[in-house]
Amino acid sequence: MDDERVSQDPTAENETDAEDRNDDDPSGSAPPQPVTHQRRLLLFVIAGVVLATDLLTKILAVANIEPGRPVWLIGDIVSLRLVRNPGAAFSMATGMTWLLTLVAVGVVIGVVRIGRTLRSPWWALGLGLVLGGALGNLVDRFFRAPGVMQGHVVDFVSVGWWPVFNVADSGIVCGAILLVVLTLIGLEPDGTRKGVEK
C-alpha cells in the first residue's frame, strides 16, 4: 500500500524530474541555453555584417580611387583617399605589421571564447563590432602585398585632421568604446551586474 501511495504522489514525480534535470548540470540549475545561443548568433551576425561591409568597401575603393587623388564629398572636410596602411587602426604603430597581426589573431580568439557564455545583447553588439573589424583588417594582413602577416591595410575615409581609416577601424573603435562603457557600469557578458548576486 505504501508503494502505491508513493507512485501516485505527483510531488514525488516532480522531485524526481527535477533531479533528472539537475544531473546534467553540476550547479544544480540548468542555464537558459537558448538565450546564450541567441546572443552568440547575434555576435556572429554583427561581425559578419561588419566584415562584409569592410571587404566590399575596400574592393570598391581600390577599384575606383586613384592614389594621391582624393574624392571630396563634403567641402574640404570629408573625402575618400586611398592609403595602404602598414600600421594599426588610424595609421598607428606603423612598421609593426607582423606584431599587429598576432594581436588581431589574439583578439579574435578572445572574443570567440567570451562568446561561449554570452547572454548580454549589448556585449554581443560590442564584441561583434570588434570581431568584424579585427577580421576585416586581418584579411588585408594575410592576403594583400607585401606578404602574409605583413600585408598593408586599405584605408580610404578621411575626415578633417583625423588619420585615414576604414569600416573595420570604425567597428573596432565603436565596439571597444561600448565594451568600456559596459564594464564601467558593471554589466557582465553573462548579463549580470557586478556586485549583484545571480
From Swiss-Prot:
Keywords: Aspartyl protease, Cell membrane, Hydrolase, Membrane, Protease, Transmembrane, Transmembrane helix. Residues 12-26 have a biased composition (Acidic residues). It is found in: Cell membrane. One of its GO terms (biological process) is proteolysis. Its main location: membrane. The active site is at D155, D169. The keyword Transferase does not apply. PROSITE patterns: SPASE_II (PS00855). Pfam families: Peptidase_A8. It is an enzyme of class 3 (hydrolase). It catalyses: Release of signal peptides from bacterial membrane prolipoproteins. Hydrolyzes -Xaa-Yaa-Zaa-|-(S,diacylglyceryl)Cys-, in which Xaa is hydrophobic (preferably Leu), and Yaa (Ala or Ser) and Zaa (Gly or Ala) have small, neutral side chains. Residues 1-34 are annotated as: Disordered. GO terms for molecular function: aspartic-type endopeptidase activity. InterPro entries: Peptidase_A8. It is a multi-pass membrane protein. Pathway: Protein modification; lipoprotein biosynthesis (signal peptide cleavage). This protein specifically catalyzes the removal of signal peptides from prolipoproteins. HAMAP family: LspA. Belongs to the peptidase A8 family. PANTHER family: LIPOPROTEIN SIGNAL PEPTIDASE. This is Lipoprotein signal peptidase. It comes from Rhodococcus jostii (strain RHA1).
